[in-house]
Amino acid sequence: MPHLHPHIDPEGLDEFSVVFTDRSLNHMSQRFGQVMRDLSATLREVYSAHQVAIVPGGGTYGMESVARQFGTGHALIVRNGWFSYRWSQIFDMGGFARETTVAMARPAGNEPQPAYAPPPIDEVVAKIHEARPDAVFAPHVETSAGLILPDDYIRALSDAAHQVGALMVLDCIASGAIWVDMAATGVDVLISVPQKGWSASPAAGLVMLSERGAERLAGTDSNSFALDLKKWRAIMAAYEDGGHAYHATMPTDALLGLRDAMEETSQMGFDAARDAQWRLGNAVRDMLAQRGVRSVAAPGFAAPGVVVSYTDDPDIRNGRKFAAEGIQIAAGVPLAVNEGEAFSTFRLGLFGLDKLKDVDGTLARLRTVVDKVIPA
């Protein structure tokens, strides 16, 4: 019998499973199987990954699944702000890491509103060689500070990690369309999400593995049931092989939307999306600099998808003045790198196909509001 709602699954079966109602795409359906295969193929292509796992929930779920799979020994964390502090929060709350070592971002100068830079790479490399961790965790883009790690910094981290037998784990949740090539940078585990760089609804953590990462996965066991990364990799493998499997319920409809958004990004061109992301981010940073607004990110480390700037105005910090003009921004948050109580910022997110396909229009809309909130 045909599906009661053909728009959900045009060639689907009449729904009498114990998992879904007629209003959701069934995880056993042919349509969802193709969605999973398409997701795997696109993610492997874009990130030069060897394997893919999808962990239901969101980016933090992906982070914790990776931590509970690979972080039970000695974890070294590059902390560039509040959302890489999240690695420490995961380890501290779970109590499963034998030891953690942290390398923190720091001010690049002594000004009252200093720009921040990641810890010097030579210092981090030396710390890796000294501590000999089992895994190194770093943020590609730090959402609280607007800091991005350049490819050569990531490559140096990976080289040092591999020299001591450690995995290199890179959080790309806030990377936007700045795709990281795992093969070129030596990254073993890369974490992304649907709702930022991929213009889809939040639903899962997307975990990509290099060959080395896949080998380590096969030889380790998670200490979580729901976040068992090896199990979620096996689920994806079942779909890749033309079948299906179940561990916990997948967000099927949201993953269908993610697949469609990936296809739209592919039609735009992954390189074109990346170039538009840089153009947009650089232009927004210039717009703010012309008004005397200071960036939290030091030159050379300024992310194009997240622009974080200083403000002394509490109604700019909390976003109220922007909301009054029709724009939703993100409030400033601490960095957790000993920045002091006076630290006060506001954050602009520049994610999504609608912005990247119309950089000029996006800049014009934002400029109209910035002119009112922060006059030149």
Where in the sequence are the language-model features?
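Conserved C-terminal alpha-helix-loop-beta "cap" of PLP-dependent enzymes
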Residues: 289-350, 354-361
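Conserved N-terminal alpha-helix of the aminotransferase class I/II PLP-enzyme fold
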Residues: 17-62, 69, 80, 86, ...
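Internal helical hairpin/lid segments
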Residues: 74-77, 250-320
